[in-house]
Structures are given as C-alpha cells and as structure tokens.
Amino acid sequence: MTNSRRHIFERICAKAFQSSLTCSIFGFTVLLILYLLDWKRIAQVPGPNLLKDLEFQRAWNDLEYISSLPHPYNSKQNEHVRSYILKSMRELEATNQSYITVIDDTLTNITFESTDNDTLTYFEGDNILVKFEGKSKDLFPILLSAHFDSVSTGYGATDDGMGVATVMAIARYYAKNQPNRDLIININNAEEDYLFGAKAFASHKLSKNVTAFVNLEGAGSGGKAMLFRSSNGHVSSAYFKGNHYPLASILGNDFFKRGVIRSQTDYIVYEKMHNHTAGLDIAFYENRDIYHTRKDDINHLMPSSLRHMMYTASNAVKNLLNDSKSDLTKFRKPMFFLAFGKYWQLNLPIYQVLNIIFAVICPIVLLLTLIRFPSLYEQLKKPRYTVCFVVSCIFVSIFDTLTVLLLTWINPYVINSHTGLILALFYLTNLIALAFSFRAAATHSKLSSEDLSSIEIVFIWYAQILWYLVFIVSVILSIYFQLGSTYWVTLSYLCTFTCCIMTIIRINYFVDNVVTTQTTHEEDALIGSSINTSSHQHYGSTLNSTPHRRNSIALSNRAHVKLIDNIWTVIYFIFNVPFPVFLCYDILVETILPAGSQTLTDSVFSSKLYKLVIFVVFLSLVNSGPFIFRALSKKSLAVLTMLWITLFVQALSVNPFTESAPLKLSFVQMYDMDRMNNTVYVKNISPFTQDVLSLNPHFLFSNGSCNTSLCYYESTDPDFGGLKTPMSIHIEREKHQLDISINSGSKWCYVDFNTSVFFEAINGNSISGMYSSVRMGQRSFYAPYTLNLTITEVVKAEVTCLYDDIHEGIIPAYNTFVEHLPSWVAGVKASTGLLKVKSSIVI
C-alpha cells in the first residue's frame, strides 16, 4: 500500500512538472515572491520615531523657508536664506556651550587659474561654518557639508534644501551632545556656480586637518537619498554600520568618474583637499527631469525623502565621529553592492584579485570535469549545437540593434519619461528573439529527439562560455579603469558556473539510473508481448494479472524518471536564470535608468544609453535560452509577438515628454549695451524647441530662427528700474598703470581682453600674473569691482555682468518665455546668468 501511494505521488509530481515551462514558472515564481518581499523591505524609509532626537518637524519648517523662492548666489533671496540659516546657527552658540563656535566667513577670498593658465577666477566666499570641538584632541576632524544656494530657475527644495535642513538638524543635535572628535559644518554658497563655496572652504584654516567628510546633495528631485560615491572602504562602512535603510550603488562612483553623469558636486573639491580627504557623497537622484526646474519645490516632495536623508546622514556622521582611528584616509578604494537583500562590502583591490582567481580557476575546474565526462565533451563539440547557439546569439544581436536603431531614429527621447515601457519592450525583444532563433536553428539543424533531450545541458554550457568572455572583458575594464560596477557580471558568471557544476552532478546521477531506464524499456517490450498473448485468454484468468502488474511498475518507473528530470530542470533554472535577471533588473531600475534616462537632452544626443540597457537585458536573459527554447510553444510565441508589436508601436508614437518628466529647455538672454539690442538663446532640441517657441509671440514677431544647436529671437529688454545703463565702467590711467572700476549691481562680472595683460590686484587682493580673462564673484551687489592692471599697448576688453534674480523683475524675457511653455516643458538656466549684459571698451 505504501509503495502504491509513493508511485501515485510521483506520477502526480511528474504530471505537475511535465514541461520545461511549468518547471520554469515554478522556479521563477518562488524566487519572484522572495525578491518582492525583500524589495518591499528595501523600499522602506525610517519612520518619525527614529528621528526624535533630530527634530524632524523643525527641519521640515527650515526646508519650507529655504525653498520658498529661487535663491541663486546672485540674488537678494539668497541673502535672506543666508541670514535665516546664520541666525539659526547663532542660536546654538547662544546656548553657552563652550565647544560650539559659529563663523560668519566673509573674509575668505580665493583666486585660481584655469587649466590653460589664461583665465583667472576671483571669488569672495560667504560660507557659514560651525565647529563642534570634540572630547578627544588626538583625532582629526570630520566635515559635514551642504550648499544653500539654488539655481536661478528652481526653488532648490531637493538641490539642496533638504541637505541644508539635514545639516541644521544634525547641528542642533550635537549642540546638545558633544561629539567624540571635532565636527566642522560647512553650509556653503555658490555651489551651483562651479563649486566655489567648497573651494573657498578648502582654503580656510578649518579645512587643514579634516580627515573625512559627508557631503549632502541633490542630483535629482525627491525619492530616497543614495550613497553615490565613497573614497574608501572604511568610510563606506561608516555609512552601512547600523543603517537599517541603506541605499547605495557603486555605479555612482563609476558614472561620475567616467562622465556618464556630467554634473558635479562639492565631493570632488573636498576629496582633493590637502592629503586627499576621504568622504561620502549622499545625494537624491530620482526624477532628474524636474531637477533644476521650478517643480523642485516642497509641493513635489514627500516628508519620507527628508526623513531618509536625515537618518542615513546622521548615522554616517555618528559612526565617523565615533571611529577610534584618527586618520581615515589611508584605506583602499571601496566596493559595495546589493545581493540577496543585503549590501556586501569589500575593497576594490580584493574584488579585482577575486575576479582574476575566478577567471583562472573556474575554467580549469570545468575543463577537468570535461575530462572526467568525455560524453559531455562529445556533445559540446557537435557542430550543429555550436551553430545553433552562435546563430541564435547573432540573430538576437541583429534584432536588438534594429530595434534600437528604429527607436532612436523615430522617437529618440522616448526613454526620458517611459523607462518602464522601454524596459518591457527590450525584455520582450530579447525573450522573443531567443526563443524564435533557438527554435528555428534547432529545426533547421534537424535535431533528433535524443538531441533535444541533451540540448538543455549543452546550451547551459554555451551560455557559461559566453558569460566567461563577457567576464574577462569586465575584469580588464575593472583593472584598467578602476571600476567596481562590473560586479553584476562577476555574480552572473558565477551563477552559470555553478549551474554547469549542477549539470555534472546530474550526469553522474543519470548514470546511476541507467539500469532503471533500461528496465523500463525491457518491461515495455514484455508488456507488449504479454498483451498480444493475453488477447487469446479469457477475462479474469490468472495469466492476465502479470501484464497489469508489469504495466504498473513500468509506468511508476517512468513517472519517477520524469519527476527526477524535471526537478533537475527546476534546479537549473533556479541557479541559472532568476538571480542574473533580478541583478540586472535592479541595476537598470535603481541606478542606470534613473541616472541616465533623463540626461539625453543635456548634451548632443547619443544612443549609448539604449545600447547599454538592451545589452544588459540580453545578458540577463541569455541564460533562459535553454528553457524558453523548449518551454514556449508556437502559440505562446505568437501571443508574445503581438504584444511586442503593440509595445513597439506605442514606443514609436508616444510623446517622450510629460508634465512629470518635462523637456528642459535652457535659456539665456544677451543684452549688448553698445548696440542696444538683446537676443534670447534657447537650446534647440529638434523638433520640439521650434514647436514650443511657435507659441511664444516674441519668437513669432521677431522672426526668430534656429540652427542645429540654438534657437534665437529678440525679446523684451531687461528692466533695471529706470536705469538706461545698468553697468558703468570707470578707468583711471597713470602711464602704464590702469585702474578699472565696474559698478553693475551684480555679484558676477567677467572681463575678457584681446590679449594677455598683467594683473596686479583685484579688489585690493594681490594677484601678479598675466591673463587674458578674469571671472569675478563678490559678496556685495553694490560694491564696485576694481582691477589694477599694467598694460604697454592698446587693449580691447569686453565686460560682461550676469543677472539671475527672476523675482526682481530684471529679466521679463524669461518670465514671458516660461508663461508660453506647455505643461510638458520646463525652462532651465543655460549657465551662470540668465541675463548677460555686456559692453566693450578700448584702453
């Protein structure tokens, strides 16, 4: 009775796992449930109870004030925000805690040369510094930094209002709790203008002994704050230690390093201070399309975003302050990644050494197994198998390439706001191409039923060979460019390697069961013979019971063998498919697409992002080839093909820009005082810019036109409050000595000469150098710029002063430009200065 029940159970299981599709669905479903449960945990943010010591509501109130209006460095609102922050920090000093010092840094002036040594930059800093003297005098200080200025076209709630609110909250906490080592806070200005605030701090005396820093930034708008960059593994561990809500990606390190993300943060300044300070760059990165736009306001934020930054930043600062090591710079480059719901950390050199070990040991192990199992080697070297796999991969590559070419030709910016659509399309493209090409190649090769039974194992080995080639390339890139973002290739390769080992175990198991299979065939023959013999017997005779018994045993053995085979298929699938799929999907959804999809309009269009995404998708699905080849029927392929056509047509026709992911058009107005004319320049993203400007009356009435990069038209003159000459230039000469005084009501002015001249001083600060251009930024709107020069010949110069304050009514052309934009378009600054007023002089 027991054997009978066992046989029935095995037959039911074999029936349940009767096809590769059923096995695949089973394995995939189990891991998908585990992944979704873990993803839900990862997606969580800290609750209000975890931030009681940081006074979250007060931080939110700070954020509301800071982001109430645009406050670029060159605006009156910037001064109001600065006064608010300084007053709040002065309150900490007023608590009479002797270890707190607040510094209103209006004394630091810096000068530096451009890389070609021909342009001089002069900048007057006005950072707000707070020093908390630590209990231990032997440990080097830690720096915490954020910038309080915004761009001229955005309210700066994420960039960087939340960073400033977080810094202020942490400052209040340490005003009540003296840190173990010195903590220096730099709430700096003019970050949006070439990181000048951080550069000013780097020349301040408080920066001299800083050993590590935490920089808070906003490279997107809202979402969760991610650890984008880290200098070494030791400071990285400070971020992860005790952090129950981490979000980090080593891809950020490499994206900034390789220029994939073009914008920069104060991190690059602090890291190069003195003896290469170690640090962390924690930044918001989602919704990059409303980054630097008027939608970067508090109405488009969730309190959970601020809570997450406050929690992760305070945790990192606490761990750095409590670190017993004085010098935190003498550690190796970091390496961290998310796998199995946990962040794993190791040093980059160790990761590279492990890669080399895997690259050598893994193929040796597999070659030794092939020597042990020559029958498998005979199968692997069959030309029809090799041709089937190679032709299939070539077909998939061609299909992927054609898909990308058509997509970027007809609707190149569709990925900007429809990343989910493009990702689904690319996954379906590769799934269909793999299934169709493998099936077609196998049919053309006329594989026998015996070949089909072994092709699953063969294709697993071929996929391993493909991954090995990709792995070798990734190892070379990792070593040559010092990249850690190739970890997903390493882990995926190890999955295929493990699966190959599992096939060896199965082959060994199958050999042990050859007798069972042979017995089944023999019994089949006996059954057939017995049935023919029994046809002449009477019903119910004793001879008739023997065939029935043998038939039952044979069917039971078949069910057992079928069950074992299909269980192995599930095991292969679990080891080979889900983890690479989830790993690749995670880096695409969490990092590559959020960081890259909304940057296509920032520079000249390139299809590199599409190619990268579809290549990663192909690699994530290539391991499924051995399964979908036999699992998907012709009807299934037909249904998937119809779905692919639907998605492809939608991707070609959908509007690439939406209200939540708008097209960003950069704006600048040039006002020439000599000719008394002005021209507005708008970045030309064809064909959208011309369609948008056709709604602007100034573009139509002035017969505006466009070239390949810019559209330009005449617009409303700037309003300087009744002044016809907003900029006055006064020159005093004495032999070869020349003093130039510029009054402009602007914090930014440039002077460009037609030849190099000798600079003696700027605003009383000694220079002594030959330059053809100077960029000047000063604290006061109304103080004149003074240049002391020495010249020996006639010199021509062009003076340009910049204006950014859109709420002072100085730039009505920008207000008109924004008023006539459709909801799916946003205006942004082209560079420092929405308005540039210039005048020429001859000396």
Swiss-Prot record:
Keywords: Glycoprotein, Hydrolase, Membrane, Metal-binding, Metalloprotease, Protease, Transmembrane, Transmembrane helix, Vacuole, Zinc. It is found in: Membrane; Vacuole membrane. Gene3D superfamilies: Zn peptidases. GO terms for molecular function: metal ion binding; metalloexopeptidase activity. The record marks Y291 as: Transition state stabilizer. CDD domains: M28_Fxna_like (cd03875). Its EC number is 3.4.-.-. The keyword ATP-binding does not apply. Zn(2+) 1 binds at H147, D159, E217. Coiled coil: none annotated. PANTHER family: METALLOPEPTIDASE M28 FAMILY MEMBER, VACUOLAR MEMBRANE PROTEASE. This is Vacuolar membrane protease. It comes from Schizosaccharomyces pombe (strain 972 / ATCC 24843).
